[in-house]
Amino acid sequence: MTEGIEGLPKLYRELADWWPVLSTPEDYAEEAAFYQELLVSTCSFVPQTLLELGSGGGNNASHLKQHFRMTLVDLSPGMLQVSQALNPECEHIQGDMRTARLGRQFDAVFIHDAIVYMTSEADLRSAIRTAYVHCRPGGAAVFAPDHTQENFKEETDHGGHDRGNRAMRYLEWAIDPDPQDDTYLFLMVYLLRQGSGQIECVLDKHICGLFSQDQWLRWISQAGFEAHAVPFVHSEFGPGSCDVFVGHKPLTAKD
């Protein structure tokens, strides 16, 4: 991952205020329910507090906040601003999931697909370590990458929404130009229209990490969690299409 805000894709910098047009909270209802049930079933107690690292525009949080008292951390000021408008009752903190240290622990920690921007072993292990440090003993952490090496397939998708006087349409293409390395490319083309004005076309390149299930489980375990993989269950995804990684922090953990 390129260091700092300047290394983020355009979607999280100059286009951040277009996020609500690209992606709506309603799109996240089903998967947020899956994550909520997984967090609750993994914890040794009924979790009350949840830290989300890489919380983005807050769409998952808009559902999870019905069940947890949430603190949301993201590197992008623009995305935090979008999330604050959607989730004013949640605490928002600007920070990097690799290095953030809030000085307190939470019953559970959640990292959604923002984890894919960890493009090296060092970056991913740092993010997992952040989750461990902030997780209360007996609590749970859930990591939800879009792909592992075992299930990656080249794919395309398209969609968009109208919102107020803005409209967006997009095309996305996930490809792996070099299967020998630990990254893949997620290319996005946005067509943006404001009011009755001209349509602007923007290309945005996302470089994403691609690791094996064994690497995920090993690094989560080495951080101190009891680790296992869980098939992601969603009506729009076939069985075995992707995995979610879960860490349970032992009740006897000292850190």
Model segments located where?
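C-terminal lobe and adjacent flexible extensions of AdoMet/dcAdoMet transferase-like proteins
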Residues: 207-255
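Conserved class I S-adenosyl-L-methionine
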Residues: 1-48
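A short acidic, Gly/Pro-enriched loop at the edge of an enzyme's catalytic core
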Residues: 98-109
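A short SAM/SAH-binding and catalytic strip from SAM-dependent methyltransferases
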Residues: 107-123
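A short glycine-rich, Lys/Arg-flanked "PGG" loop and its adjoining helix->strand segment in the class I
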Residues: 125-137
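Class I SAM-dependent methyltransferase SAM/SAH-binding core
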Residues: 51, 57-100
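SAM-dependent methyltransferase
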Residues: 142-214
